Amino acid sequence: MRVALVEKFGGPEVLIPAELPDPVAGPDEVVVAVDHIDTLFVQTQIRAGAFGEYFDVKPPYVPGGGVSGTVTSTGAEVDPAVWAGRRVIAAVDPGSYASLAAVPVDHLVPVPDGLGLREAAALVHDSVTALALLDLTALKAGETVLITGASGGMGTLLVQLARARGARVVGVARGPEKVALVRELGAHEVVDAASTDWPRHAAEALGGAGADVVLDGVGGELGAAAFPLTAHGGRFSAHGAPTGHGFAAVPADEAGRRAITVLGIADVQLTPSRRVALATRALEEAAAGRLRTVIGAVYPLERAGEAHAAIEGRGLVGKVVLSV
């Protein structure tokens, strides 16, 4: 099978095309002929050698993420009448940057009719985390939510899902193109993070009380600046760190004094069955036209290094996916 292989830690150039033996389905697995591959910013950081304390990954390795495709073979304990030839998505980590993937059958999510495999791939991870965050923070109709990184793969989904829950949505994005996209997706107000004074503009957009929920997918200084915008008794989620400067630093004394519930990425580590349930919800919403996937660029698998460079360049909106 064809793969994109990280030969050593480093820049995007270390991600090279290679050939590996085709996988064989284990007893409770299927083999998926991959159509499109979901990419995650964290994979660019792992490739660069970061987060070794969280991810036990050593080169050479095939990066992980998610795939969409068609089941081509089934293991001895898998019913081929149910799964053979079926369009599916699945989280595959490591090993998703490949033309074939062996996947446990209980990790599969069928793709409904009317939804393309490219769009389905873009939902493998981000939609699951987005739905989990909204469930975890218990965002309700009539509440106000501040979403940083609102033009990214998960941010674009959060904007739509929060709006669908009846919340008032204030997005934070950088630059006029990204601001326009977030507004188009349904945000009531959008603040341009390119302005050094963006926290003041966000405070004005939120009103005097602040945000009932802050969903910070950026981290670093921007995430830290978003924390004071949380209302008394609100919920603050620090779940993203694409800046390379870590998750948002939250002063515990202030959080306690203002009765703010602080959540992190550890709070959305989900069981396979929970992931499947949330992904099923997301695919159904997308197939019905109620959830739009924003795909900023598509690169062939052989150019995965270029895809990583584009992701790190931060110029694109939405998701970057790989085609096989």
Locate the predicted segments by residue:
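Glycine-rich beta-strand-centered segment in the early N-terminal region that forms part
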Residues: P21-D38, F51-P94, G217
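NAD(P)H dinucleotide-binding glycine-rich loop of Rossmann-like/cofactor-binding domains
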Residues: Q45, D56, G65, R87-S151
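Short, well-ordered loop/turn sites that connect or cap secondary structure elements
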Residues: V82-W83, L139, T230
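Short glycine-centered segments of the SAM/dcSAM-binding site in methyltransferase folds
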Residues: R87, T144, R168, G234-R235, ...
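Mid-domain Rossmann-like dinucleotide-binding core that forms the NAD(H)/NADP(H) cofactor-binding site
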Residues: S127-S195
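Short amphipathic alpha-helix with an adjacent loop that forms part of the alpha/beta core around
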Residues: D197-G208
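Glycine-rich phosphate-binding loop and adjacent beta-alpha segment
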Residues: E221-R290, V324
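C-terminal hydrophobic helical "lid"/dimerization subdomain
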Residues: S273-V324
